[in-house]
């Protein structure tokens, strides 16, 4: 499903542990290409349904293994480099994403990169919240910056242990 502007609807997943570190995964076959889990939204799915399906497929986690803390308000878009743009119809020039911030409720051992099909990642680790911004492939960097910035207040609530009020930490 690609919109009239050529963007494919997608979900991005920022999964944080109780210490505020986020799951960072290396793509299979990439030249040391690391990213957050993400994936397309099918025509019959809501963004939240796609989130849970992608979470299961990519890192083997179920809905009960996580808690949704926040989601970005609008779509965040990035354009693919020209060499990655699909030329056949419908032409896909990039992705438009809803980003979810999740809290991991399960033990680390619940992460299973084999998931429900061919693996997309071959390694994962916990990293600091802002670390991915300097490491992700350049064409995704601005979307990562915007998503991390928008979701930083609910992320910081993990560190303080305080509830959010109108999207802000009580610290």
Curated annotation (Swiss-Prot):
Its EC number is 3.6.1.-. The keyword Cytoplasm does not apply. InterPro entries: Nudix_hydrolase, NUDIX_hydrolase-like_dom_sf, NUDIX_hydrolase_CS, NUDIX_hydrolase_dom, RppH. Pfam families: NUDIX (PF00293). This is RNA pyrophosphohydrolase. Residues 6-149 form the Nudix hydrolase domain. Accelerates the degradation of transcripts by removing pyrophosphate from the 5'-end of triphosphorylated RNA, leading to a more labile monophosphorylated state that can stimulate subsequent ribonuclease cleavage. Belongs to the Nudix hydrolase family. RppH subfamily. A motif (Nudix box) lies at residues 39-60. Its cofactor is a divalent metal cation. SUPFAM superfamilies: Nudix (SSF55811). Keywords: Hydrolase, Metal-binding. One of its GO terms (molecular function) is pyrophosphatase activity. It comes from the Bacteria. CDD domains: NUDIX_Ap4A_hydrolase_plant_like. It is an enzyme of class 3 (hydrolase).
